[in-house]
Amino acid sequence: SLLGADGQRVTSEDQRGKLTLYSFSYLDCTDACPQSLDDIARVRQAVGEALPADTPLTFVTISLDPARDTTARLAEMPPEARGQSATDPAWLLLTGDPMRTRYTVGGGFGVYYSEPKEPTDGSPGRVTFDPRYVLVDGLGIMRAEYRTGTPDPDLIARDVNLLVEEAANSEGIARLGYEAAHLFLCYPR
């Protein structure tokens, strides 16, 4: 489990029944960063515009610098900087114990990153990582990966809509097929 800005534990079980788009970054990830929070906010907005208003999609960004991105630091970040209102629960920023985060991100999502290297000029150190978004269905199954810092929002919206339709139309034995299916294997890009 990881922690939200409010210090509350967030587990994969909390996301059950929700479609979730995971991303990975850190607060000091700016100019030359492969996937900054600003980039994620733009993707979130574009995907939101491409989806029907009633589509249940939660965005979760996991910090790759949990030693510096504490819950207190996440809480100081104004919601507007994340492209949301103060009461919008649809984008969670998570942090946690550095080792737990490494296990969760590497073991659970296959995202590997370096520890921040402290530069000599006093600026925050950079974390090296490959940008990635991961779409997880309401059963906790990874259904698609987008290995780019700026994925096509129409592609994500299409995939989310396919999952919504798939879940709505599956019953009995078809439901078992739904649970075992992986979007990136079943649907062409």
Model-derived features with residue positions:
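Thiol-/selenol-based redox modules, centered on thioredoxin-like
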Residues: 116-189
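Structural microenvironment flanking redox-active thiols in thiol-disulfide oxidoreductases
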Residues: 37-104
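Structural micro-motif
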Residues: 89-91, 102, 109-115, 128-134
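Sec/Tat-exported extracytoplasmic proteins
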Residues: 19, 33, 44-51, 78-85, ...
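Short active-site neighborhood of thiol/selenol oxidoreductases, capturing the structured segment around
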Residues: 10-40, 59-60
